[in-house]
């Protein structure tokens, strides 16, 4: 009732009207993907602004028909803050952030490819391995971006092929910092914030074991999984996720742990002294006891896995540019090291013989590659396109304000 | 880089000169002279004291850490370099800065809880509807260009503690000096490490015993005014035989470090004048002036 009396010439500084409008600056050409956070669209710059863009729209929550401001999720806040701060050739480039109509639009450079799509392409119509020099360039750029994140005290926490973007000129960009966060003396332990991180297939053993104080090493495990997947064209540890129960306690990911053990052998306190103090240690023991002795290998079979992977992929048997060879195996085994304190760091990995030997590494991972990858799929209809078989990343722990709002509303009804 | 101050948005976009800050404030005054004469407000530092006390109230029940309160104070300062305070509801800005800072500093609080808590303290200024706070969050983020990562001097302090073998009393005093610097413009004027060094000097030169901070800072102001001359002299004269060994060690370290000593001295003076003006602080007065402004301009609607 009082609103009419407000002097229109002096709008309240806390009210909000966007100074920039997305549609004035960008022409939306289609829909790329959607997730728990919202949707990603492909757009072209307008009014003299050249180039292609990917616009990530964080969905505003709908309470009834009228969209209300309900507070932004912490994941959106983190991604906005970190992307505004970071600047590196191997980390996705943020163009700008527009806050409009109670929604957030993060405008990124457009990337034509991502590793998920590239890996998929190599299984069609029949399996044909990704050339060894390309794998090496991808991995080098990925580690280079990760080193930058880690020296900036940023943990990515959700590295997986779908989040590793590739430009049409073969540059790798680490994308999706929605789960990333600073780890310099956090106010709360990292565990208390988000109870579940990293898509299960790429989740490090210390997370599966319930570790409360995890480190950048979780990202390096994920890089190891990605390396293996680039070579074999399949996720190396393709476990099934045990869902969170109604009490919101995080279950032991028995199946995923089993997949790791099948290749890496049972972790023991000799190779990983810290394991005995892990919260899920008893679960691991009961898992080991549940099978006949000898069911799980006592020692790592990674080398066997690697050799047959090279053979199946038709990588050259003698050393040279045609194969990741023995150096590649050594690096992989250091990335997939059980003990996070012994696992190779991004810095060490970049100095590994796999990169030192075997000549220069191109900043264009497609260099010398004859094939062509299909363009990113952009659809005109705005329907949900979910890749049903892929497990998503849980963004729990931090109750998304908007979701909580909805849940409590439902409860009342 | 997120954790590297030198490449940070804080250094690139949120560091002002004194003159620039004064120009900004003068331009606000020029643009709305009527409001300025109709609604006089206390000195900015007194308002800052008031805001910080409101933040502490808000944070208390939610057991918020000091760093989140510090971040909130920086957000408020940044916001008011873009907005005339007389066009805003400061209670809403304070609450929103708190809500946003808690998320950024990884101690998130639910929006409903924050609004409920704020209404406990200022029922007449905070609407029960959370959407007001949500809208203000958009305004805050937008005015700050989503540059939400704040570098604080606390980190430098804890890094320097072993190097300068600071006692726990000295660290505690330096810590509270850092807390106090958020009541001035210093966070917008100097890098965090300069502030930390200033706080350490103050702590080492003026013993903790002399001080009971917050509210009764007058003795410290006096001590700093008188004793400050000594350290300033010592800093200028590296061969001086005057100050005790403890201080000499610090002076030696300062001379070798690449810290901008002139900036450190300017910060000390800024702090001295804060403690002087603090004597005039009246919570009631701030509350009345702000309340009158918000109510008669309907800024709470």
UniProtKB/Swiss-Prot annotation, chain A:
Domain Protein kinase: 26-355
E.C. number: 2.7.11.22, 2.7.11.23
Alphabetical list of InterPro entries matching this protein: CDK, Kinase-like_dom_sf, Prot_kinase_dom, Ser/Thr_kinase_AS
Biased composition (Basic and acidic residues): 376-385
Cofactor(s) for this UniProt protein: Mg(2+)
Catalytic site: 158
Family of this protein: Belongs to the protein kinase superfamily. CMGC Ser/Thr protein kinase family. CDC2/CDKX subfamily.
Name the record gives this protein: Serine/threonine-protein kinase SSN3
Native organism: Aspergillus oryzae (strain ATCC 42149 / RIB 40) (Yellow koji mold)
Recorded name of the encoding gene: ssn3
From Swiss-Prot, chain B:
Stretches of the chain forming a coiled coil according to its record: none
Subcellular locations according to the entry: Nucleus
InterPro entries named among the record's database cross-references: Cyclin-like_dom, Cyclin-like_sf, Cyclin/Ssn8, Cyclin_N
Entry keyword Transcription: yes
Keyword list, A-Z: Activator, Cyclin, Nucleus, Repressor, Transcription, Transcription regulation
Single Gene Ontology BP annotation: regulation of transcription by RNA polymerase II
Domain Cyclin N-terminal: residue ranges: 53-142
GO cellular component: a single term: nucleus
Main location: nucleus
Any matching Pfam family: Cyclin_N
The keyword Repressor is annotated on this UniProt entry: yes
Domain of life: Eukaryota
A molecular function (GO) term: cyclin-dependent protein serine/threonine kinase regulator activity
Known function: Component of the srb8-11 complex. The srb8-11 complex is a regulatory module of the Mediator complex which is itself involved in regulation of basal and activated RNA polymerase II-dependent transcription. The srb8-11 complex may be involved in the transcriptional repression of a subset of genes regulated by Mediator. It may inhibit the association of the Mediator complex with RNA polymerase II to form the holoenzyme complex. The srb8-11 complex phosphorylates the C-terminal domain (CTD) of the largest subunit of RNA polymerase II.
Family, per entry: Belongs to the cyclin family. Cyclin C subfamily.
Assembly behavior: Component of the srb8-11 complex, a regulatory module of the Mediator complex.
Protein name: RNA polymerase II holoenzyme cyclin-like subunit
UniProt source species: Aspergillus oryzae (strain ATCC 42149 / RIB 40)
